[in-house]
Amino acid sequence: MRADLVPGAVFPDYELSDHTGKHRKLSELQGQDPMIVVLSRGSYCPKDRRQHEGLLELHGEMEVGYCRLVTISTDNITDTYEFRTGLDAHWPFLSDPRRIIQKDLDIAEYTHPEHNPMIPHTIVLEPGLIIYKVYVGLLVLRPTVGGRSAPGFAGRD
């Protein structure tokens, strides 16, 4: 990840096509709310699929708390649409097959040359695309006291 993208900095206002082909800017998707941006490896990855299954439950809690969610992957629009639909997700999935974000943020995953994905990141943004926290790795559900699942992060922050 670029060294200048730290808490307090402004995250770039990328404009990409969503799962329907419509061009969307991150700032427009965010509005005046906090937002979580998931930089995904893509629909081919079983770990990413599991992460997004967990995000389905979390998304309901986020909506009640006026927090936005967006997923960005290097999948083409067709794969992005199928991934979102297959999950029955109701938040925007953005498609970046030209790998604009991967190159700009310097997050190419060198371990998987066939799909050339991004290293997964989860970025928590305050209103105005201001970075609150950057997590490297996949969001996973971990057990908690009482047997309920709680979100946690695999990787480092």
Feature roles, as predicted:
Residues 1-157:
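Chalcogenol-based redox active-site neighborhoods
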